[in-house]
């Protein structure tokens, strides 16, 4: 029998790229790559792990985190807060801009066991200290001089192994009370198009409309001006410019059109950007996320986000099929990042990034970003994680909800136009 480095036996495999949904199989790893997947593999292994009763999936991909630790107020430690909670690939979304990216590369990307990728902020300083990131008034796009398109393009071209797209925040509070939003958005669109990479847009309480007025085809909108492969993050927030028409309770027409065009709707839960009510309305209309992501950062790791699997748990509670939940955190983001030949599946030859998950019963009140609670009856928790075939420790699971965080979040409910009592 052939010898391999690792074999994971008897797991329930969910691998959407290969259309495997619940088969009891073994997974073999050799030389840091997936060697084979099948029933009763005839191999001997240096290390053997029994995954009976557990889900075995490709290594989870968190498509939206902030992990520029110490250099930005939001920066988490990716190995502690992502890898140790079952995530093998984390995408830092906009913490760094062209002027600050090399620090992210040298001190985070190159030193982390977690695979860290990047969406480069259109603002040269990224989220070094701006608006909600730094606790000071104003934001990173208040001054258009900071949005150096040429510098952004040059940084992307020189670092394509790490930089997979562009990021912009469209919110009046970080764009000179809305005065610079249109131009900032146009620059971000132009840079991403010139570099042939996707654009991720944070779109909350913005002067750029979600739904353009009838006949206003020339008015720039979001997501109306996004293209196939672009990311619309924070898709389920309940503030002004939510995806829901507050008059008729339907998902906006421009949002539906964007999905048909190939725009990817990303959860980006965050400290303030996931609303149970918005998600429930969307779910009833079949508007599920393409990608489930956490927007994990220093202000939400102890609630209301906790980790990616907790966000996945919320969509399982909403009725999203488990297979689709796994797909939205594996092959869909891998394809969107142009990395589906390396990560996102258990295909032979791909990097041996593997997450083993327990789906367990619970009876817990789980909060959204604005203090609304739902009674969750099942949860997903990480059991084992392997990055390039190497096993890493899992941190203990956390308790929900965090009452201190609930008190801190209370003010955000007042800003919502969609909420439980409206």
What are these regions, as identified by a protein language model?
Residues 66-68, 95-96, 121-125, 139, ...:
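Active-site beta-loop-alpha junctions enriched in small/polar residues
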